[in-house]
C-alpha cells in the first residue's frame, strides 16, 4: 500500500534548456508557481548536462533515464526504480518521442500508482507525421500539400513535381529546406537513414510560424492553450 503523502510528486522530462522542443523547464516552472512547496518535482533526463534542470528551486531531484532506443522495458524499470524510493503520483512526458512510450506503459504505471494523461495508440497513429495531412483534410484544416515518399529513389521525381524551394521532413522529426534536386536527394537520404520510413515532401510556404501548446481533458475539451510565434527560424525550420 502506498503511504499517504501531504505533497504530490510529479515526474517531468525535457530539460535541454530550450522550451522548444524540450518544454520540461516551463512545465516545472508552472507547477512550482502554482503549487509552491506542496509539490516534489522529479526531473527525468537523458543527459547529465541538461542545463534546464539546474536552476535553483526548480526541481527537487534529477534522474538519468536510459535512451528510448533501449526499449519500453528499460524505461519502465527505471521509473519503477525511482518510484520504489519516492512514490510518484503522475508523470508528464514533455518530449514528443516519449509520448508513445509512456502511452504504451500507462496501464503498468497505473498499477503502480502512477497516473498519466495521454492519448491511446490508435489516436497517436492518427496524427503521426505520415498521417497528419489526412487528419487535416478530414477535419477541414488547411495544410500544405504533403507527399510521403517511402522509397527515397523516387524523391527526385516528386521533388521536381512540387518545385523548389521545398521542405524535406523525416517521418519522426527533423526537417530541411532545400533549393535543388541534388539537395533534396541528399537530405532525404540523411533523414531516411536517421528515422526510417522514407521522407515527407512539402512546398515551402513563407509566413509567420507558431507553436501551440494545449492541455486537454479526457473528453478532448481544452483545459488550457498557449500559442507562441517563432521570432527566429533556423535552417531546420
What are these regions (language model features)?
Residues 1-117:
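ATP-binding N-terminal substructure of ATP-dependent carboxylate-amine bond-forming enzymes
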Residues 117-123:
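Hinge/lid segment of periplasmic solute-binding proteins
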Residues 123-208, 216-222:
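Active-site nucleotide/adenylate-binding loops and adjacent lid/helix of ATP-dependent enzymes
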Residues 212:
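Catalytic cores of alpha/beta
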Residues 224-226, 235-237:
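Oxyanion-binding "anion nests"
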Residues 230-231:
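A short acidic/small-residue loop/turn micro-motif
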Amino acid at each position: 500500500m502506498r503511504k499517504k503523502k501531504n505533497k504530490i510528486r510529479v515526474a517531468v522530462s525535457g530539460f535541454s534548456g530550450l522550451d522548444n522542443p524540450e518544454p520540461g523547464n516551463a512545465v516545472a516552472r508552472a507547477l512550482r508557481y502554482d503549487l509552491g512547496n506542496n509539490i516534489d518535482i522529479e526531473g527525468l533526463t537523458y543527459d547529465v548536462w541538461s542545463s534546464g534542470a539546474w536552476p535553483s528551486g526548480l526541481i527537487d531531484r534529477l534522474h538519468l533515464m536510459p535512451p528510448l532506443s533501449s526499449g519500453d522495458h528499460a524505461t519502465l524499470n527505471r521509473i519503477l526504480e525511482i518510484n520504489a524510493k519516492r512514490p510518484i503520483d503522475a508523470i508528464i512526458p514533455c518530449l514528443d518521442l516519449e509520448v508513445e512510450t509512456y502511452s504504451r506503459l500507462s496501464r503498468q504505471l497505473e498499477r503502480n500508482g502512477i497516473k498519466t494523461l495521454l492519448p491511446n495508440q490508435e489516436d497517436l497513429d492518427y496524427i503521426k507525421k505520415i498521417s497528419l495531412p489526412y487528419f487535416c483534410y478530414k477535419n477541414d484544416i488547411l495544410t500544405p500539400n504533403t507527399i510521403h515518399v517511402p522509397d527515397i529513389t523516387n524523391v527526385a521525381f516528386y521533388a521536381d513535381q512540387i518545385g523548389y524551394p521545398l521542405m524535406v521532413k523525416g517521418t519522426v522529426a527533423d526537417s530541411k529546406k532545400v533549393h535543388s534536386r541534388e539537395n533534396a536527394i541528399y537530405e532525404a537520404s540523411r533523414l531516411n537513414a536517421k528515422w526510417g520510413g522514407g521522407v515527407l515532401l512539402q512546398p515551402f510556404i513563407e509566413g509567420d510560424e507558431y507553436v501551440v501548446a494545449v492541455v486537454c481533458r479526457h473528453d478532448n475539451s481544452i483545459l488550457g492553450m498557449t500559442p507562441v510565434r517563432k521570432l527566429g527560424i533556423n535552417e531546420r525550420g
